[in-house]
Amino acid sequence: MEPLHADAVLAFRARHTATGLFEATLIPGIEAVLDGLAADGVTVGLATAKPTEQARTTLDHFGLADRFAVVAGGVADGLPRSKAMIVGDALAQLAEVGLRDPSRMAMVGDRRHDVEGGRAHGVTTVAVGWGYAQPDEWADIEPHHQATDPVELLALLRSLP
């Protein structure tokens, strides 16, 4: 990573940790998705490009930490990691709690990297219609499924094997 780029990443992370995560808002309907999955006995994990501790702090801030069995972050030893590596870490953590079959899992995300990361491990991919993706981001990658809102996402996840 170029020194100037590395400095910018460090500055962004510092601001995000200090104030940015507290300025964020939850996508309306996401808590209902998590409640529905919990009621169905589904184990939920998080695979994020954010550093693991930032992700945990964000989950704590929103009162969601207890809904995620595993959290895999994007920084290990200070080096950037691909989404495939992060998903691999999440899968390894899930295996530690007895969940070992990627074909019975789904990677839900708003960016093409989420789809690529899930596909790299044989995980069903679901692209969501909110978040940071550009309108044409899915054009050439073809996730297995797409959901336009949290209600559709929950119904879709419930329909998977």
What are these regions (language model features)?
Residues R15-A18, A72:
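Short amphipathic alpha-helical segments at helix-loop
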Residues A6, D35-A38, T52, R56-P161:
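Asp-based, Mg2+/Mn2+-dependent phosphohydrolase catalytic module
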Residues A18-L46, T52-R56:
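Short, acidic loop-to-helix structural element flanking the phosphoryl-transfer center
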Residues M1-E2, G29, D149-E152:
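Acidic/polar helix N-cap motif
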Residues L4-R13:
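Acidic catalytic patch
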